[in-house]
Regions:
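Alpha-helical transmembrane segments of integral membrane proteins
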Residues: 1-325
Length: 325
């Protein structure tokens, strides 16, 4: 895909928001038809709040860019709503149940509501496509385990992210775990370059933060742009955490394989570093090596964040039902 340009394409952002809401409706309909063991009315309210945030983000993006196009500036109400969505989305995420599909669905809605506010074109569709790919990956790994008779659980609906903390359910490493680790590294690189070469400063468009601020503030704008870059990484890391749970393998064991693959990549690019030729060739070879080394450290941070987002849940007081005698 080409680098995101400076000409905004808001209809694509609106289409991404509407597509997210459509997928959410189908997912909620499927959830309502599921067994009562995995459904709670209070949990459904959380999903409706998240869907409302996605719809609100879609409206704010459209309204803000129309206002800026008409030379009317950033509406104060849109700015307040944008910051409220940015703060409330992670909280709503942690209120959802920790069952595998329900938590992954909640992660998608929370991150999409933020990503839409930071999008100006086709990149708004990228998290949806990436999440669909992650969904297929998790199902594929579960089907592979069932084929070889290594999984004792027939349905992914039975998996809970909190099982990852139970050491009694861990198994030994297999050769297939190398494939899973390689896929994770491949998807991380895909998330890195999915919307263009983010190693280039030309890929960052200040128009992406116009829903939050229009006054030049380098630190604030830089932080928001880094958040936009990190969201696809979070999706991939959470999917990798789901793979670890479904395959009943310790997260540390599987992530050590990832680090070995990353070190091999870093060693390969280290031998490609040039100290001769044009300045462009020298700078490109050095930047490739630095990016791979930084990616290794960044994956460790993302792995810890994914464990937090998938296993933790904020408890709210539930209303008790009183029966009259």
């Amino acid at each position: 895909m080409p680098v995101v340009g400076r000409d905004p394409n808001i209809p694509l952002v609106i289409a991404a928001g509407l597509l997210t809401l459509l997928i959410s409706c189908f997912s909620l309909a499927s959830l309502c038809k599921s067994e009562n063991k995995y459904r709670d009315n209070e949990d459904l309210k959380v999903y409706f709040y998240q869907m409302f945030s996605v719809a609100l983000s879609t409206y704010v993006v459209s309204s803000t860019h129309n206002s800026l196009k008409n030379k009317q500036g950033l509406p104060v109400m849109n700015q307040i709503i944008s910051w409220m969505i940015l703060v409330s989305s992670p909280v709503l995420l942690l209120l959802s149940p920790t069952f595998l599909f329900q938590r992954l669905f909640s992660i998608l809605l929370s991150l999409m509501s933020i990503y839409l506010l930071l999008s100006t074109g086709y990149e708004a569709l990228f998290p949806l496509v990436l999440f669909g790919l992650m969904f297929v990956w998790v199902n594929m790994e579960q089907e592979a385990l069932q084929h070889y008779g290594l999984s004792r659980k027939p349905k992914l609906a039975f998996f809970n992210f909190t099982y990852a903390m139970d050491i009694t359910q861990f198994r030994q490493l297999h050769l297939d775990d190398i494939r899973r680790s390689f896929f994770f590294v491949f998807f991380i690189v895909t998330a890195f370059f999915g919307t263009g070469n983010i190693a280039s400063i030309n890929s960052f468009d200040p128009a992406s933060v116009y829903c939050f601020l229009t006054v030049f503030s380098p630190f604030m704008m830089g932080g928001l742009l880094l958040l936009k870059v990190a969201i696809p990484f979070v999706l991939v890391s959470c999917a990798f955490e789901a793979v670890q749970v479904t395959t009943q393998l310790s997260s540390k064991s599987l992530f050590l394989i990832v680090l070995v693959i990353s070190d091999i990549m870093a060693l390969y690019f280290f031998f490609l570093v040039k100290d001769y030729g044009s300045w462009l060739d020298i700078g490109t070879s050095i930047s490739h090596y630095v990016l791979v080394m930084s990616l290794t450290i960044f994956m460790m941070v993302m792995n810890g964040l994914a464990q937090l987002l998938t296993t933790q849940r904020l408890g709210l007081p539930r209303r008790t039902k009183h029966h009259s005698t």
